[in-house]
């Protein structure tokens, strides 16, 4: 297994390609908004979102999911429930990706104990050919992107506040991604995952 950490060039122009495929692969856009706007967005999303603590079975017990979650529809009548700040964030995403996003899922990582295990997005809940757009706010956190089959490459990247990560639909077949726990002192982070869902899909 080979691990590739990315040290970003702060003066780089345009996106950084982490993984390549015929649908755009995985591209990282650092600093799509400045620090002041990213900080304001973080505070607004944190305070205006109806966060939920989900639980899940694990072996012989039920445990808390290690993060808070929420989700909103971006279109239709259900979009009225969306905090206004999300429309502003969605417009920024649209400036970098013209996919017709229909839903946004939010994760609130309160500290280094909160995480998400390696996974790929459920392809049956996505419209093929459209990417997933991930906006990061708050403290930086490392994402691990792991190839499922040999040579099982691992790409590690610190997702900075105000950044955008685009992951192709095709990438979900071949790679998992996750946010591991960390023992280092880190502040809270919010991620917003924009997706294109089939009609009548109520997921995030």
Report each predicted region and the residues it spans.
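Non-heme Fe(II) oxygenase metal-center motifs and adjacent flexible, charged/small-residue loops
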Residues: 1-204
């Amino acid at each position: 297994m080979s691990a590739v950490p990315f040290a970003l060039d702060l003066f780089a122009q345009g996106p950084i390609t982490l993984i390549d495929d015929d649908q755009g692969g995985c591209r990282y856009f650092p600093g799509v908004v400045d620090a002041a706007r990213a900080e304001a967005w973080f505070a607004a999303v944190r305070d205006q979102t109806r966060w939920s603590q989900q639980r899940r079975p694990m072996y012989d017990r039920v445990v808390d999911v290690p993060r808070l979650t929420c989700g909103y529809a971006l279109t239709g009548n259900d979009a009225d429930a969306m905090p206004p700040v999300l429309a502003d964030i969605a417009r920024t995403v649209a400036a970098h990706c013209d996919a017709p996003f229909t839903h946004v899922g939010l994760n609130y990582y309160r500290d280094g104990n909160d995480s998400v295990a390696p996974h790929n997005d459920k392809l049956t809940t996505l419209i093929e050919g459209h990417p997933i757009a991930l906006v990061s706010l708050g403290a930086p956190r490392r994402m691990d992107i792991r190839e499922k089959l040999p040579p099982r490459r691992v790409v590690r990247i610190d997702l900075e506040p105000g950044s955008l990560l685009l992951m192709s639909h095709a990438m979900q077949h071949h790679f998992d991604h996750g946010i591991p726990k960390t023992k280092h002192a880190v502040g809270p982070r919010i991620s917003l995952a924009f997706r294109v869902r089939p009609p009548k899909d109520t997921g995030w």
